């Protein structure tokens, strides 16, 4: 892979996995980007699938400030849905698009350090960058890592990590270009219009007004953190417009550009 092109770190959500056409488009774009000489890492959640599995097992989905509460009895279901089914759905789609991929989680290769985020959230983790060696090895082979947001702490507890937060840590690890993809075109204002550029002051104002809330609040906070840490913009965009990803190679913005402050 070209040394002068930053690795593209794409975060995708669970809704994408329920849209076969959207998934195929995303993988076709990823394949083209890899062929052009740029490495790609896919980091994923799988909230919709987790919700379905919990419901099928007679369990409730509870969220606190946009983060999923994960009590101990739900851990096997969450891990199975994310590190298992969701990861393999994405890998199958990658193979179909001609991409050589490696399905993995945050536990692999000591890439991150994991710990319990907040006792109120149960087995929800927060992670920090540790060692990029394993990821760099995979990228050097021209392979695309597909990373589920399941981590392990030093005590051996399986932890559910918010996928936006997981993607920020992966982007830091490889010093990559982060794009957070969701099912909306970017960050929207109170009238539902796309905000082209967003800085911390504007984000804080919209959060106070309740315009940015729940899952988007977590996403914007993650984007601001990486933008500031790396001194470069982070994109929040829609996976429905996956063809636009090639525009990033030319330095063009897609969706909302979250700026360092």
Curated annotation (Swiss-Prot):
Q: Which organism is it from?
A: Shewanella loihica (strain ATCC BAA-1088 / PV-4)
Instruction: Site Transition state stabilizer: give positions.
Output: 11, 219
Which Pfam families would you find in this protein's record? AA_kinase
Where, by residue number, does substrate bind? 46-47, 68, 160
InterPro entries assigned: AceGlu_kinase-like_sf (IPR036393), AcgluKinase_fam (IPR004662), ArgB (IPR037528), Asp/Glu/Uridylate_kinase (IPR001048)
Q: Name one GO molecular function term.
A: acetylglutamate kinase activity
PANTHER family registered for this protein in UniProt:
N-ACETYLGLUTAMATE SYNTHASE, N-ACETYLGLUTAMATE SYNTHASE, MITOCHONDRIAL
Please identify the protein, giving its name as recorded: Acetylglutamate kinase
Q: List, alphabetically, the GO terms of the cellular component aspect.
A: cytoplasm
Q: Which superkingdom is the protein from?
A: Bacteria
Q: What is its EC number?
A: 2.7.2.8
Biological function: Catalyzes the ATP-dependent phosphorylation of N-acetyl-L-glutamate.
Q: Which gene encodes it?
A: argB
Q: Name one GO biological process term.
A: arginine biosynthetic process via ornithine
Q: Which family does it belong to?
A: Belongs to the acetylglutamate kinase family. ArgB subfamily.
Cited Gene3D superfamilies: Acetylglutamate kinase-like (3.40.1160.10)
Keywords for this protein: Amino-acid biosynthesis, Arginine biosynthesis, ATP-binding, Cytoplasm, Kinase, Nucleotide-binding, Transferase
Q: In which pathway does it act?
A: Amino-acid biosynthesis; L-arginine biosynthesis; N(2)-acetyl-L-ornithine from L-glutamate: step 2/4
The listed locations are: Cytoplasm
Catalytic reactions on record? N-acetyl-L-glutamate + ATP = N-acetyl-L-glutamyl 5-phosphate + ADP
């Amino acid at each position: 892979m070209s040394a002068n092109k930053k690795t593209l770190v794409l975060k995708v959500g669970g809704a994408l996995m329920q849209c076969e056409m959207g998934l195929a488009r995303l993988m076709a774009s990823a394949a083209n980007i890899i062929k052009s000489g740029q490495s790609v890492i896919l980091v994923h959640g799988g909230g919709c699938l987790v919700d379905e599995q919990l419901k099928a097992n007679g369990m409730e989905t509870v969220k606190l400030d946009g983060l999923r509460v994960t009590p101990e009895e739900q851990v096997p279901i969450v891990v199975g849905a994310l590190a298992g089914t969701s990861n393999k759905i994405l890998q199958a789609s990658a193979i179909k698009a001609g991409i050589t991929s490696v399905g993995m989680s945050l536990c692999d290769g000591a890439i991150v350090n994991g710990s319990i985020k907040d006792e109120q959230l149960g087995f929800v983790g927060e992670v920090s960058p540790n060692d990029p060696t394993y990821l760099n090895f995979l990228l050097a082979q021209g392979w695309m890592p597909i990373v589920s947001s399941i981590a392990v702490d030093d005590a051996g507890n399986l932890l559910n990590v918010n996928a936006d937060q997981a993607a920020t840590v992966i982007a830091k690890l490889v010093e990559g270009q982060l794009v957070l993809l969701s099912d909306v075109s970017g960050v929207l204002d109170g009238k539902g219009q796309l905000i082209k550029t967003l800085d911390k002051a504007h984000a804080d104002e919209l959060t106070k007004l309740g315009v940015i809330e729940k899952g988007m609040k977590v996403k914007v906070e993650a984007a601001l953190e990486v933008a500031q840490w790396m001194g470069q913009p982070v994109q929040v965009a829609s996976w429905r417009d996956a063809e636009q990803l090639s525009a990033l190679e030319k330095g063009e913005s897609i969706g909302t550009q979250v700026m360092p402050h």
